[in-house]
Amino acid sequence: MMDPAAGSGPDGAAVVPPELPALPVAAEDPMALYRQVLRDFKELFFCLEPMEITRYVHRNEGRCLSLGPPKGWHVMLRTEDGIITAAKQAASKLICCREPLTPLGYAVILLPEPRRDHHDGMVATPYVVFMGRFSRVYAYDTREKYMVLVSHNLDELARYGVSRSEIAYRDVIHTTLRRMTVPVPRRYPKGARTMHVLFLNDTTPEGSYATAERILGCDVKLHTPGYGTVIMRLMKTVQQLHRIWPFCALTEVESRRWWWAVRANLATPWYVLGVTGRPRPGRSFVAEVLVLLDWFGAVYAIQMDDPNHYVRRVANTITEFFRMGLLKMVFRHRRFERERQRQTRMEHRHLCPHHHERAVDHKRDILFNEDAALPDERRERERRILQQQYDWLCLTERFDPHEGAWERLDPNTLVLHRYDTNSQSYVLDPDIVGVEAAEREAAGHQDDTGPRLHCLVTTRSSTREGAERVITALVHQSRLVTYSDPFPLKSLTGVREYIQI
């Protein structure tokens, strides 16, 4: 990946990027990042035409604008080069409607001051950032050739930044961050138990693993950024699934039909990782999402209350899955890519973000009186309306510094939102989903010592060396290890397509 800080200006002269801005310290005002985004994008917010955005980028080339949380994410303004031009052409083909996409530059991650040196003050990413109508922000991945909708408007960008986008949790980004910064050990609450989830087969010679906070037994916490924490019960076999609801209600014929459909969709040997849901005292565990892995380590989920029971990808690797949880299921329909690629990866189909714009444009024509007003007067009136909207976004009383946005202060809105992307708030009550009750029960079992390692491995390896590599490394703590072998792939005929379960 090229260095976005280097390059030439519009006149061929070398561009010297300005000094990188200092990142705020962690203990400062929690609303500082929100206000920083509003300040950085103020001039872009008032741009009425794509050409105005382009001129702004030319004037401020090399400047970094904050993209909100997670802290450190910025867009470095750059005029069009070969990579940006190619990304713009590809993104224009992926967008569902004829929306003008104006490139802003490359997404970068600025490192905190103590971790910077003289040469590596930032981490370059493969994402090109675009701005559409009504301050919509998109990011195009130049490696995997897809685009995500980062935010629908400036308010959403300032509140949530890129935390709702899968691009913030990719392994390639976090691997680079670990290489360029001093490793910081992940901190768990005092006395917390941990569970290591290991994935190892012929496709991953070195293996990969993730660490989760264990509650009790094989129950771990799965956190989805911007949504909340749910209980995930790790499973080893389909027989274990038959002990929980609704799988315990399936007949033998229905069970075979279920697993046949999973095989037909994944088209590889596959593993059961577990289910998310809630325990019920004296009754079966209620499964809400079934989580699977294919032979290559990609993670898929099946939403149990969806009558179609589609198999959908939620992460490329197990490490990404425990980093972002069910983010792609909660904030879904934001990924734009070629249809063949979407079907191959089994991604959610995007939803058009423009379906309300026709009505909005009609109201704008009425508001600005296009037929009667002169063009200059119309633009002046439009800028005046935008100024009023921007002033409203900057009102400090809209937020509580400890609770966040105002909807969290209204008791009438403290409800459980599940996979509702139309809502601006996602309040996940830990008591409703059973996390608090499970933690209280775990507190009474301080003597619980295992299991500590959940393995998704091929114990029946085709080579003796492979079997010894897996078994020997873990045999000394076999009492604390659970295994999950892959389900074999039976030969299937016909075209691979989505098969309803």
UniProtKB/Swiss-Prot annotation:
InterPro entries: US22-like (IPR003360). It is found in: Virion tegument. Signal peptide: none annotated. One of its GO terms (cellular component) is viral tegument. Keywords: Virion, Virion tegument. Belongs to the herpesviridae US22 family. This is Tegument protein US24.
